[in-house]
Amino acid sequence: MSNHWLLPENIADVLPSEARKIEELRRRMLDLFRTYGYELVMPPMLEYLESLLTGTGHDLDLRTLKLVDQLSGRTMGLRADITPQVARIDAHLLNRPGVTRLCYAGNVLHARPAGFHATREPIQIGAEIYGHAGLEADVEIQELMLAALTAAGLSDIRIDLCHAGILEALLAGLPSIRKIEDALFAALETKDVPALRELTAGMPQTERDALLALPTLYGGVEVIERARATLPASPAIGRALDELAALAVQVRGASVNIDLSDLRGYHYHSGVMFAAYVAGLPNYVARGGRYDKVGEAFGRARPATGFSLDLREVAALSPVEVRALAIFAPWDADPALRAAIAGLRAGGEIVIQSLPGHTHELDEFNCDRQLVRKDAGWVVVPR
């Protein structure tokens, strides 16, 4: 007999206690974004593939679930990342001059899980600034990311900083690098120095030495000065290190690390990149950076920076307790009781009315009060 209740691998239901926490954090974060002036957008779950993947890297293509549209015959994709969709909205639909701040929250689907235990259906929430090329926008986004994690109750946060411009400058004079690009990125991300030695054999010595040095350029902000002494003294690398130094001093409420080989998302980032970690966990809980080139694919190149996180992951780490206080009410046909319940609910109270025969069943709400008949009416008293 088949098990009709089975779900695909790395797909799971969200049960009430987890769903309450996820929804609480979603509301907290969206309300937080609104206090900074971010406007909510809701891109579609499904788009034509060429639109969904425009301006993105090969990694997003591999993570995108694809199907054929029965109306048009064209290939469509279920979004694996909302960020490119928001870039499309800014570039093509809003078409505003000046600065635009947008935020979003929604499910995404991954054809492959990011890790062994990772969900293939994250709930992505994030914020983006378009139209300002200065580091001030990156500072605001980084501040907002930390505020969102703090709103979720997380503490002891570390920010790792990197810059896509450093690797871009090192590879600019090496057109043949495209053949080994993916392997090179993988070796840098995992700090696999033996693999790097093999991959860089035959490269010009200056670039090779710099690439081999990147995995060692990890640690506190003093790494920036070590990088200045170790890497080629090109204007592009100098600017990138200056930006990292300026961003590092702006971090409040978190420790700062520099990791010049943390290049996840390099294909679509164009400047500073940052990731947030919490103590005791090897994987980041939020990630962001600058991606000025994404809007160009939609016909409007705009400076852009943003961050995102998975609400399901953050909810699993969050100490926030979301067990709502409620009022217990008996089942009674008395119109006065119905009026009392309606008035309490209109005022924002949770009122749970027991059904006949189920008065003593427990639920996940904390009914600390109850409605009782008193004189000719109904009143709320402690339970």
Swiss-Prot record:
It is found in: Cytoplasm. InterPro entries: aa-tRNA-synth_II/BPL/LPL, HisRS-like_core, HisRS/HisZ, HisZ. It comes from the Bacteria. GO terms for molecular function: histidine-tRNA ligase activity. The keyword Amino-acid biosynthesis applies. The keyword Cytoplasm applies. Pfam families: tRNA-synt_His (PF13393). Its main location: cytoplasm. One of its GO terms (cellular component) is cytoplasm. Disulfide bonds: none annotated. Required for the first step of histidine biosynthesis. May allow the feedback regulation of ATP phosphoribosyltransferase activity by histidine. Belongs to the class-II aminoacyl-tRNA synthetase family. HisZ subfamily. PANTHER family: HISTIDINE--TRNA LIGASE, MITOCHONDRIAL-RELATED, HISTIDYL-TRNA SYNTHETASE. Heteromultimer composed of HisG and HisZ subunits. HAMAP family: HisZ (MF_00125). This function is generally fulfilled by the C-terminal part of HisG, which is missing in some bacteria such as this one. This is ATP phosphoribosyltransferase regulatory subunit. It comes from Cupriavidus taiwanensis (strain DSM 17343 / BCRC 17206 / CCUG 44338 / CIP 107171 / LMG 19424 / R1). The gene is hisZ.
